[in-house]
From Swiss-Prot:
It comes from the Bacteria. This is ATP synthase epsilon chain. GO terms for molecular function: proton-transporting ATP synthase activity, rotational mechanism. InterPro entries: ATP_synth_F1_dsu/esu, ATP_synth_F1_dsu/esu_N, ATPsynth_dsu/esu_N. Produces ATP from ADP in the presence of a proton gradient across the membrane. Keywords: ATP synthesis, Cell inner membrane, Cell membrane, CF(1), Hydrogen ion transport, Ion transport, Membrane, Transport. It is found in: Cell inner membrane. Transmembrane segments: none annotated. F-type ATPases have 2 components, CF(1) - the catalytic core - and CF(0) - the membrane proton channel. CF(1) has five subunits: alpha(3), beta(3), gamma(1), delta(1), epsilon(1). CF(0) has three main subunits: a, b and c. Pfam families: ATP-synt_DE_N (PF02823).
């Protein structure tokens, strides 16, 4: 499968494990001040997250969602990392 030119690398990590590592085209996450969306080319960012639903648009055009228990989201270059206490 070829990587989309709109995709970027995302890792979702808990203290126990690497929950997700792959290419996504969009992430919607619950920031402390409300939902925010990240797409390829976003400016560098470090944001605190509250508990809530995270939605991913994957590079194969499918979607996925899950609940997180707070954490932090970092965007730097063409990579993003979501650190959370727990994910389900």
């Amino acid at each position: 499968m070829a990587s989309s030119d709109k995709a970027f690398k995302l890792d979702i990590v808990t203290p126990q494990k690497l929950f997700f590592s792959g290419e996504v085209t969009s992430v919607i996450a619950p920031g402390l001040d409300g939902l925010f969306q990240i797409m390829k080319g976003h400016a560098p960012l470090l944001a605190a997250l509250k508990s809530g639903k995270v939605r991913l648009s994957l590079s194969d055009k499918s979607e996925d969602s899950f609940q997180i228990e707070g954490g932090f989201f970092e965007v730097s270059g063409n990579k993003a990392i979501l650190l959370t206490e727990d994910v389900s």
